[in-house]
């Protein structure tokens, strides 16, 4: 299989999605709010693999992947006290995420040892999120671009390769949609967005490629 110019496969896996959060640190009604990403909740991923052999150790891979998951942001007041009618302390807001990644990766493989072959992978691509609800407190922009890197190992079976792989993905863009671009947003929900200056995507994926 490693000697084929092109081969195909599919992937199944788990994802852990979140944000890198930057606060505004601007007082809102006399209180400063801080946001952080809560513990990452696992989601699932499914994708398709196209692999082009460039050399003995180098491959170019196209792996469009659809992810299902949820991101949760927790808000805390600087004083540690809730503000009546606005935000509570330790209040959580969930954002439904249904993104598709369209990446290109370079895969560098070591020499095969018996029935396994470790590798490193790096690349980037486009990210489009089908999730989100404009009526919710937090609404993110659809398009983003990212870089990713990781490692894995080809495990050779009789008829296919099983390739467990772990990757870390970092988005470039500020995906937060400001209140000024959301005229339909309820006033009581605007505080959640106004407390944030910047949101960038991040994701850890554990995938199993069948090739």
Indicate where each model-derived feature is located.
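Residues that define the transmembrane beta-barrel architecture of outer-membrane proteins
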Residues: 4-6, 40-44, 96-100, 116, ...
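Transmembrane beta-strands of outer-membrane beta-barrel proteins
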Residues: 6-12, 60-64, 100-102, 118-124, ...
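Transmembrane beta-strands of outer-membrane beta-barrel pores
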Residues: 14-18, 66-70, 110, 124-130, ...
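Repeated loop/turn-to-beta-strand initiation elements of outer-membrane beta-barrel proteins
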Residues: 18, 58-60, 114, 159-162
């Amino acid at each position: 299989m490693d000697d084929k110019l092109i081969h195909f496969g599919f992937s199944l896996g788990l994802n852990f999605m979140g944000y890198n959060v930057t606060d505004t640190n601007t007082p809102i009604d006399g209180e400063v709010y801080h946001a952080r990403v809560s513990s990452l909740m696992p989601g699932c991923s499914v994708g398709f693999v196209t692999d082009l052999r460039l050399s003995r150790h180098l491959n170019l891979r196209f792996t469009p992947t659809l992810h299902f998951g949820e991101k949760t942001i927790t808000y805390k007041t600087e004083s540690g006290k809730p503000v009546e009618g606005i935000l509570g302390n330790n209040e959580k807001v969930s954002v439904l995420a249904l993104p598709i990644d369209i990446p290109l990766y370079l895969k560098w493989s070591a020499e095969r040892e018996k029935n396994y072959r470790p590798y490193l992978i790096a690349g980037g691509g486009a990210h489009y999120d089908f999730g989100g609800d404009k009526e919710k407190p937090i609404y993110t922009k659809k398009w983003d671009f990212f870089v990713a890197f990781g490692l894995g190992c080809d495990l050779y079976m009789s008829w296919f390769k099983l390739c467990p792989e772990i990757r870390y993905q970092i988005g470039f863009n500020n995906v937060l949609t400001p209140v000024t671009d959301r005229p339909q947003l309820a006033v009581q929900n605007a505080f959640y967005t106004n407390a944030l200056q910047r949101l960038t995507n991040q994701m850890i994926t554990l995938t199993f490629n069948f090739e």
